[in-house]
């Protein structure tokens, strides 16, 4: 019996979703294709009917993961916006929170891959760069900032999360997040004038 129409696309998207969780948690080089396929509940042999190689999967996962992050942050901004807090402040509070730091499999892929991206293929680096630019545009627009200020804000946010995840001292990690939130909000208040 043949598979229903759209089955192959559904399986492909399921693999990308599984890969996004794995790459966010373990990085690209520390995770194998068999592990990704097992996480998706599939056999390794089926991978090549969906992707040419691991690099193609990583590139498509970067696009998916940033889309996922932007959608999540937009929902947070829409839900938490009130008279006392702007949309960008709600996004900063979440992005630089212990929840985002600790739930790596659902978090932003930018800090998750920042330490290894320069050592991956040029195609992957180009995909990461394209998605970083898209994320900067999203944050810059929400903050009402110019592009240079947006570069600084996103660099600060992504770097803070990467460092907060890297350190072994929980209080120090929390302090980094708190300082990052304060700094990011100051940048928004200065940059949006």
Features from the language model and the residues they span:
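Helix-turn-helix
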Residues: 14, 22-56, 60
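Hydrophobic alpha-helical connector segments
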Residues: 60, 74-106
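Short, basic, alpha-helical segments at the C-terminal edge of helix-turn-helix-like DNA-binding modules
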Residues: 63-69
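Short alpha-helical scaffolding segments that buttress acidic/His motifs in well-ordered protein cores
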Residues: 91, 95, 110-114, 153-157
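Hydrophobic/aromatic-rich alpha-helical bundle segments in the mid-to-C-terminal region
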Residues: 122-130, 142-193
């Amino acid at each position: 019996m043949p598979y229903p129409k759209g089955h192959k696309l559904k399986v492909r998207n399921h693999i990308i979703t599984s890969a996004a969780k794995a790459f966010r948690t373990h990085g690209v080089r520390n995770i194998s294709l068999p592990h990704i396929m097992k996480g998706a509940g599939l056999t390794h042999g089926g991978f090549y009917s969906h992707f040419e190689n691991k690099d193609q999967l990583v590139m498509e996962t970067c696009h998916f993961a940033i889309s996922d992050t932007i959608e999540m942050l937009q929902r947070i901004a829409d839900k938490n916006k009130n008279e006392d807090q702007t949309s960008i402040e709600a996004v900063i509070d979440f992005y630089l929170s212990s929840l985002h730091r600790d739930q790596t499999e659902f978090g932003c892929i930018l800090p998750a891959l920042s330490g290894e991206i320069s050592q991956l293929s040029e195609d992957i680096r180009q995909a990461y760069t394209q998605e970083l630019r898209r994320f900067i545009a999203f944050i810059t627009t929400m903050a009402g900032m110019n592009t240079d200020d947006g570069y600084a804000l996103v660099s600060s946010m992504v770097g803070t999360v990467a460092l907060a995840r890297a350190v072994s001292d929980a209080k120090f990690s929390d302090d980094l997040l708190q300082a990052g939130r304060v700094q990011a909000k100051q940048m928004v208040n200065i940059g949006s004038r």
